[in-house]
Amino acid sequence: MFTGIIEYLGEIKQISLEKSNRVFYIQSDAASHLKVDESGSHNGICLTVESVKKNIFRVTAIAETLEKSNAGSWNPGDIINLERAMKLNGRLDGHFVQGHVDGTAICIN
């Protein structure tokens, strides 16, 4: 669960393909606070941290996530919004946000 309040910004440094999945290497000050297997919000999409080295961490978006979100359009150099998972013993500012994306839409007006 997330609050929807952006804590950090991250820069997509590298993208690699693994079958139908996209692996993102993201540089951010958030990396020093992350742990492997921790969920985080990446532009509102819940992705799991797979590795952390210095100020770069790795996450993978599977085919369904790429199909139902805008993660498939991310490119090296893009800046994305980051938020760590909400703590139940902290303040609950913002809103309850799960980060499970059902689809995308285009705003025409």
Where are these regions (language model features)?
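Conserved loop->alpha-helix
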Residues: 1-109
